[in-house]
């Protein structure tokens, strides 16, 4: 299950985390077990990608309708993309709120993630158990061959 806003963005944190995240991602990609992910809240940025996303080989990614999936928090994105417009506007808070809602619907909603192929299906919370069981039943007996490699990238 995924509910992650992202990672701290300081240079010190990036230095600490780069190797750890690379190793974790390598292990996720290399694993041969069935990989099913349910996004219950937020899945932003690199943290959202490495938490068993389609991008690193998840077999199924499901999301609840209220899930927010994208590269960054909608308000942060709006503050970057519309910085000049916000600065020049008399009612900055109203503009930020309006643009944040637009951005969230267009880029970060579960529906937009499904259209992009980032998730396989949107499920209602009451159906979670049933859908997870179905996913694992479909993957029963999954056979995946990982070729032996002489070198890794880590």
Task: Label every model-predicted segment.
Residues 1-154:
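Ligand-binding clefts of soluble mixed alpha/beta catalytic domains
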